[in-house]
Design a protein with these regions (language model features):
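Cytosolic, long alpha-helical scaffolding segments
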Residues: 1-187
Length: 187
């Protein structure tokens, strides 16, 4: 979904953004059903074990919910921007953002493999990588904020790009927290 949102904005593809919207809603509904089943399953654990697992389960659950909201906050302005045929993102911004999107996608793939398999041996590397990505995004975001103060022609596109940078940074934070909570839950 993250990939569909970012690619949809960069390529001005409304269909890709609408697909991301449907995927996001389906994933959120699936997560709600899964969470209910997990809560019922937690009742069958030993009391002391359930207390510890319950904390990490709810932290992970809250992180996943925040990931959904983060993607939605990224999607809605992007969908509006592309649907209304506003000026596209400048090529410079697309060139700057593309490698970050690729790194985030790679991080998502590794995180998903870890969570699905329950093997968190590479968790520390993902956390370090996420931290360095957040720092890079912060630097780009600050330069965009400075750029916004001096630019007057393409403010909507710059604000959209700034929103995408901020939400990507928040998205990475939530992924890092999810990895940590999942690792502790599996222990």
């Amino acid at each position: 979904t993250f990939n569909n949102i970012t690619q949809g904005v960069m390529k001005e593809n409304i269909r890709q953004l609408r697909t991301a919207s449907h995927e996001l809603e389906a994933a959120r509904d699936k997560w709600k059903r899964y969470r209910r089943k997990e809560i019922v399953g937690m009742r069958r654990l030993d009391y002391l074990q359930a207390v510890e697992k319950n904390t990490w389960f709810h932290l992970g659950s809250n992180n996943l919910t925040q990931i959904f909201y983060c993607l939605k906050r990224m999607l809605e302005p992007s969908l509006e921007h592309v649907d209304n045929n506003f000026n596209p993102l400048p090529k410079v911004d697309i060139i700057e953002f593309t490698p970050i999107c690729e790194e985030v996608d790679a991080m998502l793939v590794r995180t998903r493999k870890m969570v699905d398999s329950g093997d968190f041996t590479g968790a520390d590397e993902v956390l370090v990588e996420g931290n360095s990505l957040k720092k890079r995004l912060s630097e780009i975001r600050h330069s965009q904020q400075d750029h916004l103060q001096h630019e007057e022609e393409n403010i909507r596109a710059t604000l959209l790009y700034l929103n995408m940078l901020q939400e990507t940074q928040e998205f990475i934070s939530m992924i890092r927290h999810l990895v940590r909570a999942s690792k502790r839950f599996q222990e």
